Amino acid sequence: MSNTGDAVSQLLGIRASGPLPLMSAVEQGLPLASLDRVVGLVSPSDRKFALRIVARATLARRRKAFATAKNAAEGRLSAEEGTRLTRLASVWAMAIEVWGETEAARRFMFEQHPMLDGRRPIDVVLDNELGRPLVEGILGRLQYCSAV
């Protein structure tokens, strides 16, 4: 299974061919449209889901700055926020690859999992960088029919 920077870039709606250009895009600040795009795919019915990635006041300030076009840089995610969003997009791409469709991938991400001590994969991925390989490991095992 490959979870290339290309698949993640496509989910983010940016042009970055490979992991290094993707890293550069994250460091320079992903556009708010990337946040909206991934949130719309992962959790379309939860209007507050974006707040798991960007604080409410920060997001409101950035949207206002972007809308008024005073400062286009203010309408971008910080490197930390972009990293969190990219981590989510990467795991989401893998979940789609394993499950083959969005609803099954969404169920996996939002339901408690016994291999995560009853935590939801979405929470494990967003709460800490160390959670990403745990969830990717489960997805890898599922792909090869060896997960419980």
Mark where each language-model region is.
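Non-transmembrane "mature" sequence context
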Residues: 1-148
